[in-house]
Amino acid sequence: THILINKANIVKTFLNKLETSKILLSMKIKTPQTIELNKFNEEIDYPIIIKSKFSIYGKDLYIVKNRQQLENIKNTLKNYEHYIVQEYIGTIEDEYTTTVYKDKSSLEVITFKRKLTGGMTSFAEIRDEKILKNYAKIIATKLDLYGSINIQSRKVGNDFYIFEINPRFSSTIYIRNNFNFHDLIWWINSFNKEKLCKIDYSNKVEKSGYAILGYKYKFFKGDDNENR
């Protein structure tokens, strides 16, 4: 029996946003400046983000515009030594999600520029961003990834800043699967010669396309813009 979970060092690092920042900096990968809240002395210009070191799905996240807001929020937090301050970078219109899958014989990367509505991805377009692809390969290789992780970033000018990495299957797994990025199936099949989940391995990951969420997702492969 196999449980699809990443290695302990990967889970431990990426569930902690402060440790995520440290390891990205050690790899010379751009990431927003990040400081523990109880050590913050306004080293970062406002606006700033306050969030839990361990939060998921955007919970316990506050955008703070000035010192008064900072003090007000600190007064409402319990155990605020468990919180971090992070530089606010870019805009929500320039947010990207990248998934990297790696096993003993393969390494695959896919990136979407996405729009969020109510915490869900309402629009996702495949983008060939070489910087993000390179970052994903560096992270996967240096941490000896065996499985799948999800990387969140924002574009500022010509640069990308990674602000979060999720060491689990992300909510875009269904979208990825429709563009031949079958990280769940690849991971399952990597443990057995019989390839329990049948897919056509000759189908390459799509290089272009987009998904739109209405009542359900609609998928468009290629560069056709007529249906946008």
Where are these regions (language model features)?
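Rossmann-like NAD(P)H-binding beta-loop-alpha module
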Residues: 23-84, 93-99
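Short, glycine/acidic-enriched loop or turn micro-motifs at the edges of active sites
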Residues: 54, 90, 167
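Glycine-rich phosphate/pyrophosphate-binding beta-alpha loops
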Residues: 58, 115-124, 166-180
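Phosphate-binding site of ATP-dependent enzymes
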Residues: 65-143, 154-155, 159-161
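Conserved N-proximal alpha/beta basic substrate-recognition cap immediately N-terminal to
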Residues: 1-34
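Peripheral (often C-terminal) accessory segments that flank ATP-dependent C-N-forming ligase machineries
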Residues: 185-228
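Conserved metal-phosphate-binding beta-hairpin within the catalytic cores
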Residues: 143-175
